[in-house]
Design a protein with these regions (language model features):
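N-terminal hydrophobic/helix-forming segments and targeting peptides
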Residues: 1-202
C-alpha cells in the first residue's frame, strides 16, 4: 500500500513517499468529504454530483432515459455505443447532459445551476433558447455559461449520426481536479430541480 502527500512546486508535482514509486502506478486522492451549510467539498465531485442529480431523476422519470456513461474525461468512452442502443430501442430527440462545470469569471457560487450555451462545442441555438425560456418560467435560479474550452458527453451526441439536440446543465465547482473540489449546495439543489422540471416540460 502506498500512502503519501502530494507536493506542488510551480507546474511540477512530487510525492513524499520514502521510495521511488513504479512508473504507471495509479494514485488517487484520499477522500475527505466536508459538508457545511453552504458547500460540499471533496475529491472527485466532478462526475459524482452529475450522477447524484441523475439518480434523483430515477425516482420520478416517466418517459425517457437516464443514462450513465464512462470515460468522458478521456475523450469518447461509452456514449457512441449507448446512443446506438438507445436509438434502436426507444429513440429520443433531446439529451440533457448532467455533469459539473467550472467556476469562471462569469460563473459563480450560489447563483444557480449553469446552463451552457456553448463550450468547445455548440448545441443548437433553438434548443438552448427553449431550455432557457422554460427555466426562466420556472423561477429556479440559473446562470448562463459561454466558454471556448471544455466539453462533455454533448460532444458525442453532436458528432453522432443521430438527429438529436443536446444541452449541458450542471452546478459549477472550483478547485477543480483536486482533493478540495467545492460546489454550492444551493446550486446543486437548483440543478436537481431544473432537471425534474425540464423532464416534464420538454
Amino acid at each position: 500500500e502506498i500512502s503519501c502527500n502530494l507536493i506542488v512546486e510551480g507546474d511540477a508535482l512530487f510525492h513524499d513517499f520514502p521510495r521511488k514509486i513504479d512508473r504507471g502506478t495509479r494514485l488517487s486522492f484520499a477522500q475527505d468529504i466536508r459538508v457545511d451549510e453552504e458547500f460540499i467539498q471533496a475529491a472527485y465531485l466532478d462526475n459524482r454530483l452529475g450522477v447524484y442529480a441523475a439518480l434523483q431523476l430515477c425516482e420520478t422519470i416517466e418517459d425517457g432515459w437516464v443514462v450513465f456513461t464512462t470515460f468522458e474525461e478521456h475523450g469518447g468512452g461509452s456514449m457512441p455505443f449507448l446512443l446506438q442502443f438507445i436509438q434502436n430501442a426507444a429513440p429520443v430527440k433531446q439529451a440533457l447532459i448532467s455533469d459539473i462545470t467550472w467556476i469562471t469569471d462569469g460563473v459563480h457560487h450560489h447563483e444557480g445551476v449553469v446552463i451552457s450555451i456553448r463550450d468547445k462545442f455548440i448545441p443548437r441555438k433553438k434548443f438552448t433558447d427553449r431550455i432557457i425560456q422554460l427555466v426562466q418560467k420556472s423561477g429556479i435560479p440559473f446562470q448562463l455559461e459561454v466558454e471556448a474550452y471544455g466539453g462533455s458527453d454533448g460532444r458525442e451526441v453532436q458528432f453522432s449520426p443521430f438527429a438529436m439536440d443536446w444541452c449541458f446543465i450542471g452546478a459549477a465547482e472550483d478547485q477543480v481536479h483536486s482533493p478540495d473540489e467545492k460546489v454550492s449546495l444551493r446550486d446543486l439543489e437548483s440543478m436537481v430541480h431544473v432537471y425534474r422540471y425540464l423532464l416534464k416540460e420538454l
